UniProtKB/Swiss-Prot annotation:
The name this protein goes by in its record: UPF0434 protein Tcr_0959
Record PANTHER family: PROTEIN PREY, MITOCHONDRIAL, ZGC:162634
One CC-aspect GO term: cytosol
Phylogenetic placement of the source organism: Bacteria, Pseudomonadati, Pseudomonadota, Gammaproteobacteria, Thiotrichales
Family designation: Belongs to the UPF0434 family.
Length: 67
C-alpha cells in the first residue's frame, strides 16, 4: 500500500489515524476496534466490511502505536 495514501486515510467511524497490518492486509483502527480489509492494494473503508479486533490484537496494535 502506498505510504502517502496511508497518511491521509482515517477511520470512517472515528476519523482517527489507521495502522497497516501488512501480514493480514488490513488497516487497523484501535479507536473503533475494527480492521478494514485491503484487497488487491485497495482499502475497503466500509464499516460493514470491517471485522472486530480481538482483545489481543487491539493490545498488540496499541503497543506498536506507542512505539
Amino acid at each position: 500500500m502506498d505510504p502517502k495514501l496511508l497518511d491521509i486515510l482515517v477511520c470512517p467511524v472515528t476519523k482517527t489515524p489507521l495502522q497497516l497490518d501488512k501480514a493480514q492486509q488490513e488497516l487497523i483502527s484501535t479507536a473503533a476496534n475494527l480492521a478494514f480489509p485491503v484487497r488487491d492494494g485497495i482499502p475497503i473503508m466500509l464499516e460493514e466490511e470491517a471485522r472486530t479486533l480481538t482483545a489481543e490484537e487491539k493490545e498488540r496494535f496499541m503497543k506498536q502505536k506507542r512505539g
